[in-house]
Amino acid sequence: MNRVQACWVFLMALGCGSDKAEEHTASETDAVAVDWDCDPIAPTRCGLPFPSTYFMTPSEDTVTGFQVALGETTIPANIDGKMTSPRFLNEKDGFSPLTPLITHFEYATAEGLVSHTDISRYLDADAKTLLIDVATGERVPHFAEVDASTDADYARILMIHPVVPLAHGGRYVVGIQGVVDGDGATVETSEAFLELRDGKTSADPRVETR
């Protein structure tokens, strides 16, 4: 039986919020420096998984009750090595309902993923990717692929593409299971996710505060 390798939650935007987003800040009692700009669920790529409520903060000033709160180093640097400011994204109260859902597992392949040529497989009991509407509990039709724009096997991003519009203000859960590498071995799951999945105590405050 496949065990879940990754799972995260995200919220679709209803409209523009204020510009009062609060960022995660490390406690004065933290024993080590914590990079709150990055989600430890996907430690190999800062900013992933995306979109995610990890990169949001509660807000009384928005329709959704949340506001995007990307850190100054969350967005990857451009080709010139310059960071992109998240200022304008942080004015939003959720993420675009048209965005693909992306994460990263080193050496992940497309083997067994729901293909764009057979989308009906998203309903299979052993589907490797799940996209669930929290309000209805129903699966959302989608297909998945790995980024083919690079020859570096370890660097390819896993992308999930909904094939129907997601609801404004909707809340969704993504689940991933049984993704394999080029040798057919299950790709490694992050320690942070294993701690969350199995209910274990973590030394990482980014896990403990979830």
Regions found by a protein language model. Give the residues of each.
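General secretory precursor processing signal
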Residues: F10-L11, D19-K20, I41, P49
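Acidic, low-complexity Ser/Thr/Gly/Pro-rich repeat segments typical of extracellular/periplasmic
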Residues: A26-R210
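Sec-dependent bacterial lipoprotein signal peptides
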Residues: M1-L14
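Ser/Thr-rich, Pro/Gly/Ala-heavy low-complexity intrinsically disordered linkers and tails
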Residues: A13-A31
